[in-house]
């Protein structure tokens, strides 16, 4: 799984200096973080709607498709902020085996 994320991160990084009209990602970078966040919000809503529909229909193909869009745009956001998806994977590894209640309590204590 991480190989796919690493390869995508490399492509996203390479688009940062590309001409705006050369790719969708390059155009997002040129429009700035607010546009990237707008797209991320749209994809979040589309994922939620797809999940609600899947709960009724039993067909998860749309929720998988929309989740891929959500992950993709999350990675564009991370790249725009100079972060690699490995940082998110490291955070998930840190939380693995940690009680959700304990993790939340640790955050609120800080």
From Swiss-Prot:
The gene is hisE. One of its GO terms (cellular component) is cytoplasm. InterPro entries: HisE (IPR008179), PRib-ATP_PPHydrolase-like (IPR021130). Keywords: Amino-acid biosynthesis, ATP-binding, Cytoplasm, Histidine biosynthesis, Hydrolase, Nucleotide-binding. It holds the Pfam family PRA-PH. This is Phosphoribosyl-ATP pyrophosphatase. It comes from the Bacteria. Belongs to the PRA-PH family. It is found in: Cytoplasm. It is an enzyme of class 3 (hydrolase).
């Amino acid at each position: 799984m991480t190989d796919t994320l690493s390869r995508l991160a490399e492509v996203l990084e390479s688009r940062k200096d590309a001409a705006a009209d050369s790719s969708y990602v390059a155009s997002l970078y040129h429009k700035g973080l607010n546009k990237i966040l707008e797209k991320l919000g749209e994809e979040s809503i589309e994922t939620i709607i797809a999940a609600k529909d899947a709960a009724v229909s039993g067909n998860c193909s749309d929720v998988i498709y929309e989740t891929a869009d959500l992950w993709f745009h999350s990675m564009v956001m991370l790249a725009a902020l100079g972060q690699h998806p490995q940082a998110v994977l490291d955070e998930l590894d840190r939380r693995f085996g940690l009680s959700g209640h304990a993790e939340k309590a640790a955050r609120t204590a800080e």
